[in-house]
Design a protein with these regions (language model features):
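Select subsegments of transmembrane alpha-helices in polytopic membrane proteins
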Residues: 27-36, 121-126, 192-202, 256-259
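Helix-coil boundary and interhelical linker segments in multi-pass alpha-helical membrane proteins
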Residues: 41-88, 131-156, 208-226
């Protein structure tokens, strides 16, 4: 609806109703760019020495924050404190990734450019970052003799996560440009994603880092097996077309809301009961839940 003297008197120069003020795009874009920056920091810290933990610890020390951070954590090991700081920054970026879409919708500022910007940020924070972190972990396990000799040469396999993220995000960007009729989940409001979402890779490898950081001595020698899953089955799941559930359509189907609620409760219980390893197992349950939901769900 056109309002004001100019709009009523000179319709030709009035702005169309669909024009969104430019400032409305910036809150969501800022969250997306924070996610991009957080992912870049994680990449830098992981690649600085391929010795996870020391680079973020030295970064904190250069700012004069390390002692205070270790005191907050109650941690006396610099490397562990550095690992936890890396995870905090990384997960803060992922939180921004969760919020940017909701903020864009709330501001009425959805658009193809925002979707593409989100994909570029995810390529760094959920593709390059887990690939670098995965390589650093695999090299650590190789150096300490945790990995069997037969697979010790596979330390570059985590790069498949980057390739899968690039493929998946390119597909998402194409769908965003083509319009709602081609969006992920093919119109089925029970599913939010086609294939595992790229941020799942960040959560998976962050969970492995967290578990490894909490392991005393060689208490988690078997983690390399989960690492191998994270650079083989995980990338395959990302590029697949298997529908996956999410929270975007919460409230539109009470039965599915109940199923997701039960799963979230179970995930929380396992994470609390088993600690960091429980968190990794909870993450593994996500694609399994999506597969079961897709197999036994009935289309409306």
């Amino acid at each position: 609806m056109r309002e004001g003297f100019i709009g009523i008197t000179f319709p030709a120069v009035s702005k169309p109703d669909s024009v969104v003020p430019g400032w409305r795009y910036w809150p969501a874009n800022a969250l997306t760019l924070i996610n991009l920056g957080a992912g870049a920091l994680v990449c830098w810290w992981a690649a600085s020495e391929f010795d996870l933990g020391w680079a973020p610890a030295e970064w904190l020390s250069s700012l004069g924050w390390l002692d205070a951070w270790m005191e907050v954590l109650g941690e006396d090991k610099r490397r562990v404190a550095g690992l936890i700081w890396l995870l905090v920054v990384w997960m803060f970026g992922q939180l921004c990734d969760v919020l940017d879409g909701a903020v864009a919708r709330a501001m009425g500022a959805q658009g193809a450019q925002g979707a593409m910007l989100d994909s570029m940020a995810d390529l760094v924070s959920s593709g390059l970052a887990p690939a670098f972190v995965g390589m650093a972990l695999m090299m650590e396990w190789q150096a300490t003799g945790v990995m069997p000799d037969g697979v010790a040469s596979f330390t570059v396999l985590p790069l498949t996560v980057l390739m899968a993220a690039a493929w998946r995000l390119a597909r998402f960007s194409r769908q965003a440009v083509q319009g709602p009729e081609s969006q992920e989940s093919n119109g089925d409001k029970r599913f939010d994603f086609e294939g595992l979402p790229a941020p799942f890779a960040a959560l998976f490898w962050a969970g492995l880092v967290w578990t490894w950081a909490q392991c005393p001595g060689v208490g988690c020698d078997g983690l390399w097996i989960l690492g191998m899953l994270g650079c083989t089955l995980l990338p395959l799941g990302m590029v697949s077309s298997l529908p996956q559930v999410g929270l975007k359509h919460w409230g539109q189907d009470k039965r599915w809301d109940a199923m997701r609620g039960v799963w979230l409760l179970a995930v929380g219980s396992v994470s609390i009961g088993l600690g960091p390893l429980g968190g990794v197992l909870a993450l593994i349950s996500y694609p399994l839940f999506g597969a079961i939901a897709h197999r036994f769900g009935t289309s409306k």
